[in-house]
Amino acid sequence: MDASTLFKKVKVKRVLGSLEQQIDDITTDSRTAREGSIFVASVGYTVDSHKFCQSVADQGCKLVVVNKEQSLPANVTQVVVPDTLRVASILAHTLFDYPSHQLVTFGVTGTNGKTSIATMIHLIQRKLQKNSAYLGTNGFQINETKTKGANTTPETVSLTKKIKEAVDAGAESMTLEVSSHGLVLGRLRGVEFDVAIFSNLTQDHLDFHGTMEAYGHAKSLLFSQLGEDLSKEKYVVLNNDDSFSEYLRTVTPYEVFSYGIDEEAQFMAENIQESLQGVSFDFVTPFGTYPVKSPYVGKFNISNIMAAMIAVWSKGTSLETIIKAVENLEPVEGRLEVLDPSLPIDLIIDYAHTADGMNKLIDAVQPFVKQKLIFLVGMAGERDLTKTPEMGRVACRADYVIFTPDNPANDDPKMLTAELAKGATHQNYIEFDDRAEGIKHAIDIAEPGDTVVLASKGREPYQIMPGHIKVPHRDDLIGLEAAYKKFGGGPVGQ
């Protein structure tokens, strides 16, 4: 596309050089800038990428978007604008022909449950033989092909490219986990959502948002982003068991479908039966009551299942067809995931990293604990510490508790575990400043019949250490290695 055409939608401040050049890519990553691409510089929290403008010029890039004039060779065109990342959204969506308009786009937001609901929607679509894409905490996936990602919601240009990649691969729908950070930072500008889903709102990320009011407002931006064009068929799916849903009803003109277990809703679950092999319930809908069986464990996952089913149903698939698909869904990685059922202990990993998420996790597993419940939880560094003692209190619902850091970054690991211990309600706990050692200890003290829960990370494949260096780490692999060493078994008979 000719750059002059591309920039017609942008009210630029100043252009230094010529826009008569062909553009086939846009990037905010200086390492990928080249001839034919636009490099968009920005001022981030830790890095001002304007300092890389000379580097991208050396790589052959002839067009940069900046917030102030840079000292660059005359053959490099500079487009000066007040808000470079806002302009990046406009340019990316225009250059790649508005990819989110070319498929059905589901957006899932909430403190807990985003990954589960988004993954369930993707898996249901696959069971229905539909080409589907997923983007979120567990990476980027088109049908069964997976790649890892760095953020739940990538920056705006990367996100647009992922949607374009899904479209080019023939995806009929794409499900996005929508983080509050991504909404506030404008990473989702220009994405055309068709269905917006809300799971819940509990305390988290106050280190970024400051107050619960600001955090709630951030979540509401997804529903505002649906727009006001009632000629389009768009829908909202809200959890009536969370009172914040009432506010979200007020920020969108589109039809709302509510679900709930404890509070009255259009879609409800009754006659719930739970086990470590899954759940069953009666799905009470405006069109009748349907028996549902699911391989997902825990009452909270019933809420997630309902949200996913309603979202897919809203776009035209019958409930009967969806319910049949739900019975045979694969596990959501790292979400109440039981590792190797052949072990004499129940070894479970989960992503729960808030007091509310941990409460629901313990509620789900406690009825099936045969002997002791051993619970390991971590606190992340450089995060809101006001939630930490409450996490420690909830963890002490277990018989034995292990406090560890989780992505300590530049914080003192001992300080993080001490903050968790402030909430302890019994003395049956221990602190480890090395999470891997804490996991090994959990297995070491476990006896046949015990349940060991490793919370806070799921299958996250790293620990963020001082200097924000990512060090390889997998709770599941460390736990399984220790369990096979103690109890025997394993894929190679350790």
UniProtKB/Swiss-Prot annotation:
**Known EC number(s)?**
6.3.2.7
**GO molecular function terms attached to this record:** ATP binding; magnesium ion binding; UDP-N-acetylmuramoyl-L-alanyl-D-glutamate-L-lysine ligase activity
Coiled-coil residues are none
| Binding-site list for ATP | G110, T111, N112, G113, K114, T115, S116
Report which superkingdom the organism of origin falls in.
Bacteria
What InterPro entries does UniProt report for this protein, alphabetically? Mur-like_cat_sf, Mur_ligase_C, Mur_ligase_C_dom_sf, Mur_ligase_cen, MurE/MurF_N, UDP-N-AcMur-Glu-dNH2Pim_ligase
Placement of sequence motif L-lysine recognition motif: 406-409
What enzyme category does the UniProt record give? ligase
Record's Pfam families?
Mur_ligase_C, Mur_ligase_M
Name one cellular component (GO) term: cytoplasm
Name the pathway. Cell wall biogenesis; peptidoglycan biosynthesis
Residue numbers of N6-carboxylysine PTMs: K219
- Which keywords appear in this protein's UniProt record, sorted alphabetically? ATP-binding, Cell cycle, Cell division, Cell shape, Cell wall biogenesis/degradation, Cytoplasm, Ligase, Nucleotide-binding, Peptidoglycan synthesis
Report the principal subcellular site. Answer: cytoplasm
Subcellular localization(s) per the UniProt record: Cytoplasm
List this protein's GO terms for biological process: cell division; cell wall organization; peptidoglycan biosynthetic process; regulation of cell shape
The record lists the catalysed reaction(s) as: UDP-N-acetyl-alpha-D-muramoyl-L-alanyl-D-glutamate + L-lysine + ATP = UDP-N-acetyl-alpha-D-muramoyl-L-alanyl-gamma-D-glutamyl-L-lysine + ADP + phosphate + H(+)
User: Posttranslational modification, per the record?
Assistant: Carboxylation is probably crucial for Mg(2+) binding and, consequently, for the gamma-phosphate positioning of ATP.
Q: Quote the Gene3D superfamilies the UniProt record gives.
A: Mur ligase, C-terminal domain, Mur-like, catalytic domain, MurE/MurF, N-terminal domain
Which positions does UniProt annotate for UDP-N-acetyl-alpha-D-muramoyl-L-alanyl-D-glutamate binding? S30, T152, T153, S179, R187
**Family of this protein:** Belongs to the MurCDEF family. MurE subfamily.
**HAMAP family with a match to the protein in the record:** MurE
The protein's role, per its UniProt record? Catalyzes the addition of L-lysine to the nucleotide precursor UDP-N-acetylmuramoyl-L-alanyl-D-glutamate (UMAG) in the biosynthesis of bacterial cell-wall peptidoglycan.
Record protein name field:
UDP-N-acetylmuramoyl-L-alanyl-D-glutamate--L-lysine ligase
Could you tell me which species this protein originates from?
Staphylococcus aureus (strain bovine RF122 / ET3-1)
